[in-house]
């Protein structure tokens, strides 16, 4: 088996980052059970 490609393309990276930022935003807003809200949690870009 020969590896042809590795890593994520730009579209996959953007989708992963958007999902991560959405989860961080829920925590920051205090919408995630068991997690305190954040006063200053910036998005990743």
Curated annotation (Swiss-Prot):
Its main location: secreted. Signal peptide: none annotated. Coiled coil: none annotated. The keyword Disulfide bond applies. Contains 3 disulfide bonds. Keywords: Disulfide bond, Neurotoxin, Secreted, Toxin. SUPFAM superfamilies: PR-1-like. GO terms for molecular function: toxin activity. The keyword Cell cycle does not apply. Expressed by the venom gland. It is found in: Secreted. GO terms for cellular component: extracellular region. Belongs to the CRISP family. Venom allergen 5-like subfamily. This is Scolopendra 20417.15 Da toxin.
């Amino acid at each position: 088996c020969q590896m042809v490609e590795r890593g994520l393309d730009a579209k996959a990276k953007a989708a992963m980052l958007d999902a991560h930022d959405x989860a961080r935003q829920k925590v920051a807003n205090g919408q995630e059970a068991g997690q305190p809200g954040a006063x200053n949690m910036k998005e990743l870009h």
